[in-house]
């Protein structure tokens, strides 16, 4: 069976692609026409009492933000920086090449001996 061949079940809406030869039928709108009647306006508008809706505060926190995190400070360069995911120390290089190293404890260097 090739493309565009129908196996029953109704008329394909893709006839415009495969050349059915018929124009698509326009959709029929069965919605009632809007009423032109107007509601009477009372001279004494009564105040409507609206119950206050309780809002769940936890639903207002964006995904990925932990409200009890100790690293919850505002960053100028965006929310997805720093140790927001792993709470591990940064691996960013803080010293210039050839300068002091924070890895002296591994390589036995440094110290004032």
Curated annotation (Swiss-Prot):
The modification Phosphoserine is found at residue 69. Residues 1-50, 79-113 are annotated as: Disordered. Residues 1-12, 97-113 have a biased composition (Gly residues). GO terms for cellular component: microtubule. The lineage of its organism: Eukaryota, Viridiplantae, Streptophyta, Embryophyta, Tracheophyta. InterPro entries: SPR1/2/3/4/5 (IPR039613). One of its GO terms (biological process) is cortical microtubule organization. Keywords: Microtubule, Phosphoprotein. It comes from the Eukaryota. This is Protein SPIRAL1-like 1. Detected in pollen of mature flowers. Residues 23-34 have a biased composition (Low complexity). Acts redundantly with SPR1 in maintaining the cortical microtubules organization essential for anisotropic cell growth. It comes from Arabidopsis thaliana. Belongs to the SPIRAL1 family.
